[in-house]
Amino acid sequence: MAKKSKIVKNQRRAATVARYASRRTALKDIIRSPSSAPEQRSTAQRALARQPRDASPVRLRNRDAIDGRPRGHLRKFGLSRVRVRQLAHDGHLPGVRKASW
């Protein structure tokens, strides 16, 4: 079980990312566009740099949806490898079977 503070911090970051997503994409489009003027591009770069660090989606951490474990995250399930194994053995994940060949 991860610390509650780490889970809450990641949730707060996710909310910040969602809040600034449209602004970030607009600024990044201006920066990437070859047709934008150099002064317009530099203005967009400064505006992007002024945004909070937590507005960047790179700072989000994939965590287990049940207990918040940060490592061994399986994107398909939204759970850690430990939790997937436990739930699969208990039969709580439909369609998941233990491999046998």
Swiss-Prot record:
Residues 33-45 have a biased composition (Polar residues). This is Small ribosomal subunit protein uS14A. It comes from Mycobacterium tuberculosis (strain ATCC 25618 / H37Rv). GO terms for biological process: translation. Keywords: Ribonucleoprotein, Ribosomal protein, RNA-binding, rRNA-binding. The keyword rRNA-binding applies. Belongs to the universal ribosomal protein uS14 family. Pfam families: Ribosomal_S14 (PF00253). Residues 28-57 are annotated as: Disordered. One of its GO terms (molecular function) is rRNA binding. One of its GO terms (cellular component) is peptidoglycan-based cell wall. InterPro entries: Ribosomal_uS14, Ribosomal_uS14_bac/plastid. Part of the 30S ribosomal subunit. Contacts proteins S3 and S10. Signal peptide: none annotated. The keyword rRNA-binding applies. Binds 16S rRNA, required for the assembly of 30S particles and may also be responsible for determining the conformation of the 16S rRNA at the A site.
